[in-house]
């Protein structure tokens, strides 16, 4: 066991710890922002229960989110980065009680190097992005350390150049209020989650320090009027760091020995520069795409880093530092799930658990279809299709990392930890993370028709573009021009149906009016264009449909009986998904109709019992 931390509670010797037994399995648990924000007590109990039951636990956390997603920490951080590039607002006074004004020097509480977060200083709390040094250099302060650096190796940083405090008019940037809101929310969470004492005091100081470091970073960005993609990554990573500090402290406060693991510098220059780890294909956006070897190297390093925690429970930031081409550009907002997946691969975990606020994957959205049932087992292909067509399961690329390692993924409810959840199993023909074979689906749900689809989902806010060409051009040239136009506009097509001179495409309606008009104008050079708005994609998904006869006929006949018009039909090459486009106003009706006709069990004693087992 590492000795970097000193006791912060009188019951330190009684803390629950991971075992040193190499034969015991690792379980990696990923908690979403809402779970961290609302169910911290449950998280600490869940971690303790898994350790008591003989597992070694590592947890990965997203940035906090409480009431609404728009007020989640990540969204607020992105808002602050946008505000940093706005002109400062003039004011005659500070206008914010207890907060740093635009003319004040940022406040940096003195860090106690031997405290609970002391380990973080020497291993993880180093510079999170080199671009800040470049910002400071442009400001003539190249000797100043990054405000994101560990305080163990520097004195409190000076604030970026600000207007003179003698000025009668202070400048208050727009991001001030946003940073204050982030700080206020995390301080309130710390006070609500921990009993008073040195540990809570230290946590509050850490929150103050991180938020004021963020403020200084935004000041510097405002002065040069630029935030690079890697700088934005660093700004966004503050959310995971704040959340994990609260979770790590809450675990310790409740008797679980934990260690904060900040991954700001897990990707070093050797990984970034390794030509074999980065694909030479720059892609359409001009950003080099990371190859699988990069993620293999990263998972290995993550496994090494987490094993260094010894018996402490690693509490891992989902943000894993600047990567070539920017984390947000390479991966997007789902980087926390990917981090958890790579941790599971690096630790050779028996299972990756994704804890949400729902019991698992259902046959349909239970908020829209009251008769929806929990699906106990699902294949990776089915989960990927459901995610792509409207159900928030887990990103397919994230899923691919653990499935390649034959590690199952279990989706569970943080409010109902005793529930079985839904398990995404790797193909059973290959070795997995566990030695035991996964239970057969027919054993769990006896009497269920094996040809039955798995789930039905809806994706709304869809538009359909129909392009017809009367020219006798070759079809490949016709399609090439269409997709070249869509590529230049940055449009991703969800469904497509083609003939030699006609193409129908369904896509999400994310374009504003001007961009859509520009796209239509460009496409009109190729052929006649019509646009249908307020549409939805209805998708029936199920691996068993590959060998079923009449699934499509049953689906479309059911919609016809319900007087629901079909605008477009598409079936994937994998044969596990049948999709059609309908009017958005019919979406909920269609969901219930298809669920009743295609996913309801025949009423017999055997299937009644199966239905009970699925509840």
From Swiss-Prot:
CDD domains: AAK_AK-Hom3
GO molecular function terms listed in the Swiss-Prot or TrEMBL record: aspartate kinase activity; ATP binding
GO CC list: cytosol
Pathway involvement of the protein, from the record: Amino-acid biosynthesis; L-methionine biosynthesis via de novo pathway; L-homoserine from L-aspartate: step 1/3; Amino-acid biosynthesis; L-threonine biosynthesis; L-threonine from L-aspartate: step 1/5
Enzyme Commission no: 2.7.2.4
Disruption phenotype: Homoserine auxotrophy; the presence of methionine and threonine dipeptides (but not threonine amino acids), or homoserine, rescue growth on proline nitrogen source.
Any GO BP annotation: lysine biosynthetic process via diaminopimelate
Family membership: Belongs to the aspartokinase family.
Protein name: Aspartokinase
């Amino acid at each position: 066991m590492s000795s970097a931390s000193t006791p912060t509670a009188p019951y330190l010797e009684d803390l629950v710890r991971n075992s040193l037994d190499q034969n015991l399995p690792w379980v990696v648990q990923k908690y979403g922002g809402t779970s961290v924000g609302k169910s911290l007590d449950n998280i600490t109990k869940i971690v303790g229960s898994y350790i008591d039951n003989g597992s070694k636990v590592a947890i990965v956390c997203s940035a906090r989110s409480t009431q609404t997603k728009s007020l989640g920490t990540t969204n607020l951080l992105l808002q602050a980065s946008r505000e940093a590039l706005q002109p400062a607002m003039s004011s005659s006074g500070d206008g914010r009680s207890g907060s740093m004004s635009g003319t004040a020097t940022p406040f940096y509480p003195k860090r106690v190097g031997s405290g609970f977060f002391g380990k973080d200083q020497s291993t993880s709390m180093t510079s999170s992005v080199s671009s800040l040094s470049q910002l400071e250099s442009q400001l003539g302060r190249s000797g100043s350390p990054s405000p994101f650096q560990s305080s163990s190796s520097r004195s409190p940083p000076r604030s970026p150049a600000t207007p003179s405090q003698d000025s009668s008019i202070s400048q208050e940037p727009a991001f001030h209020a946003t940073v204050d809101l982030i700080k206020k929310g995390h301080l309130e969470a710390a006070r609500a989650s921990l009993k008073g004492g040195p540990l809570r005091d230290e946590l509050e100081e850490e929150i103050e320090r991180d938020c004021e470091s963020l403020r200084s970073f935004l000041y510097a960005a405002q002065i040069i009027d630029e935030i690079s993609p890697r700088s934005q990554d660093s700004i966004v990573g503050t959310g995971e760091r704040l959340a994990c500090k609260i979770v790590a402290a809450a675990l310790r406060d409740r008797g679980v020995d934990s260690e904060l693991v900040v991954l700001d510098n897990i990707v070093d220059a050797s990984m970034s520069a390794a030509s074999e780890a980065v694909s030479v294909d720059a892609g359409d956006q001009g950003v080099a795409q990371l190859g699988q070897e990069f993620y293999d190297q990263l998972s290995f390093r993550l496994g090494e880093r987490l094993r260094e925690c010894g018996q402490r429970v690693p509490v891992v930031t989902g943000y894993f530092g600047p990567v070539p081409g920017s984390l947000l550009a390479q991966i997007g907002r789902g980087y926390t799930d990917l981090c958890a997946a790579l941790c599971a691969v690096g630790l050779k975990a028996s299972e990756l658990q994704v804890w949400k606020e729902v019991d698992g994957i259902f046959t349909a959205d239970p908020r829209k279809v009251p008769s929806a049932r929990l699906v106990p087992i699902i294949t990776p292909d089915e989960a990927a299709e459901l995610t792509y067509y409207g159900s928030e399961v887990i990103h397919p690329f994230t899923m691919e990392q653990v499935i390649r390692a034959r590690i199952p993924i279990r989706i569970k409810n943080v409010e109902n930890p005793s529930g079985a959840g839904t398990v995404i199993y790797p193909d059973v023909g290959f070795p997995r993370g566990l030695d035991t074979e996964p239970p057969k689906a027919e054993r769990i749900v006896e009497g269920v028709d094996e040809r039955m689809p798995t789930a039905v989902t809806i994706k709304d806010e869809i538009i359909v573009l129909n392009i017809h060409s009367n020219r006798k051009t070759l079809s490949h040239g016709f399609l090439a021009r269409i997709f070249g136009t869509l590529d230049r506009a940055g449009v991703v097509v969800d469904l497509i149906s083609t003939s030699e001179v006609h193409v129908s495409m369904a896509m999400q309606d994310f374009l504003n009016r001007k961009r859509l008009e520009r796209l239509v104008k460009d496409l009109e050079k190729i052929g006649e264009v019509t646009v249908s708005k307020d549409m939805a994609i209805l998708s029936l998904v199920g691996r068993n449909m590959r060998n079923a006869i009449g699934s499509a006929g049953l689906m479309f006949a059911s919609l016809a009986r319900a007087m629901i018009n079909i605008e477009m039909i598409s079936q994937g090459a994998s044969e596990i998904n049948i999709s059609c486009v309908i009017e958005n106003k019919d979406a909920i009706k269609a969901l219930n109709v298809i669920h009743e006709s295609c996913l309801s069990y025949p009423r017999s004693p055997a299937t009644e019992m199966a239905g009970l087992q699925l509840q």
